[in-house]
Structures are given as C-alpha cells and as structure tokens.
Design a protein with these regions (language model features):
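Conserved Rossmann-like nucleotide-cofactor binding loop
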Residues: 11
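An anion/phosphate-binding loop that grips the pyrophosphate of nucleotide cofactors and donors
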Residues: 39
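Structural motif
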Residues: 43-45
C-alpha cells in the first residue's frame, strides 16, 4: 500500500512516520501534489499554529490539493483542525471540509489547565449511540454498548484548541466540556488525539484507517 504523509511546517510528523514503519509500511513524506493524488491513503498529521500552517499550505496550493483528494485522508491533531472551516488560533480560514469552527479551551475552574495534555477516554456521540452504530475507524475499539475497565479506549491528547461536537463527530472526549475527538465526512477522517502515541488502541485505529 502506498501511504503518503503531507509534508508542511508542522511538528510531530515523524512520530507518525515511525508508527507506520512499526507496521512495516514505509510512507512517503511529500508536499508534491501528484504524489499525494496518486497515494492509496493520505495522512495529514502535525502539531503547530493553525494560521502559520495555513499560510504554508496556501502558498503551495496544498489546501486545494488536500480539499480535492478522493482517497481516504486521515487528519491528526492540528490536521483535524485545519480541515475545519475556521480556527480561532490566528483567526484563520482553514481548508473547510468540515462545517465546524475550532475554538480555544476556556478554563472554568482553577484545575482546568490549557493545553489539555494526557490520556483521556473516547466515547461515542449520542447520535451514534442512538443508532447503535460505530464508524469503521473505531471497529473493535468503541461500542454502542457500555464498556468498562480494560475495554474502555484511552488515547493521548496534547492540544489547546478543540472542535465542538457537531454532525460530523464520530467520537467524543471530555475536557472542560465534551468535544469532537474524531470526525468523518466522505473520504475524510480525523482525530484530535495522537494515535501514534496511544499504544495498542492507537495502532488499531491506524490499521482501521488503512483498511478503509
């Protein structure tokens, strides 16, 4: 399988490269439009400042390239945020796949720290619980039925901005308020957390994406 990773001015990209190598996949790290279009799967990870990232992407017209991709695309961390309509981080318009805006966490109590950093539990949004369904990205991880103890899915987060729960949400987390831990629309899948740093749960999520 040919897996491409979008190369841009963001941190943490190489941790995703290493995660794929542990799965015996050698990804292509590229900002070339043709190579991204030809890939079987495209991953769009990263940590960084949304406005600076969008400036870089637009200067190379990568925002248009990403928007027009037809194969499964996986946005991770700031990659999820950049696929939204607008971000408060730098007050910038983003790629616009998801009709959602990115907000900054507003601490409500003294113990609320920003950035949110650490392990947190994934849950199904109420809409999917009502349907009794789970998105294929979370096959074997989440369930409409209550999960307890070791069957609960915990993943690793580091972020100061979040996407509110919306019609695209396929998994939620709760920090200060419930928010979109993961989203899906058409061929675009995202997560706010770092699957490459989330142990066996994260590895299974990446495998599920590659099998879409």
């Amino acid at each position: 399988m040919n897996v491409a990773i979008v190369k841009y001015n963001a941190g943490n990209i190489y941790s995703v490269v290493n995660a794929l190598r542990r799965m015996s996949i050698e990804p292509l790290l590229t900002d070339d439009a043709e190579q991204l279009q030809k890939a079987d799967r495209v991953m769009f990870p990263g940590q960084g400042h949304a406005a600076e990232a969008m400036e870089y992407l637009k200067a190379r017209r990568l925002d248009e390239v990403i928007r027009d991709l037809k194969q499964p695309v996986f946005g991770i961390c700031v990659g999820q945020q950049l696929l939204c309509k607008h971000s408060e981080e730098g007050d910038v318009d983003c790629i616009g796949i998801f009709d959602a805006d990115v907000k900054r966490f507003q601490p409500q109590k003294h113990e609320d720290k920003v950035p949110c950093m650490g392990w947190n539990k994934l849950s199904l949004p109420q809409s999917l619980q009502n349907e009794g369904s789970v998105n294929p990205l979370y096959k074997g991880i989440l369930s409409p039925l209550p999960l307890e103890g070791s069957r609960e899915a915990f993943v690793y987060f580091v972020h100061s901005y979040y996407v509110p729960v919306c019609q695209h949400t396929i998994a939620t987390a709760d920090y200060i308020l419930p928010y979109s831990a993961s989203m899906h629309k058409d061929n675009f899948y995202t997560c706010q957390f770092h699957p490459e740093k989330s142990g066996k749960v994260g590895e299974q999520i990446i495998k599920n994406f590659l099998e879409l």
